[in-house]
């Protein structure tokens, strides 16, 4: 289950719990997406399905998220979308790892690790695996290519598994 961590821990914990009950085998915590990236193709095609209420059912069906709403999404879709858009932007720190461990029994994978020191710190904190990723360059399209960071991340990770996913030709 890939978690885009909301500001409210209660919402995150509810999503994680539901993922466990649904049979997911790992928690992938996305670190490389605080805001939506600059995507020229999406802008040209007005491709933002979330702004029309699509692909948000995990949130709209979540009892804790619904508790943030004054009316159910079926009655006030725009307010539900606005609430969804406003719950992100909280940057996780290493101090949040114990909370994540408490929130799940699943293995934890940190997605967005692109520096050897971060891989080493993740291993030291008992993280189960890391994704060397810049979200395909779609979120941080001005950053260093993850492929260039991969050897250092692998070295820093030691025996911890390292996964890789990112744009190779273009993030846009």
Residue positions per predicted region:
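Active-site entrance/lid segments in N-terminal catalytic domains of soluble metabolic enzymes
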Residues: 1-124, 136-139, 148-151
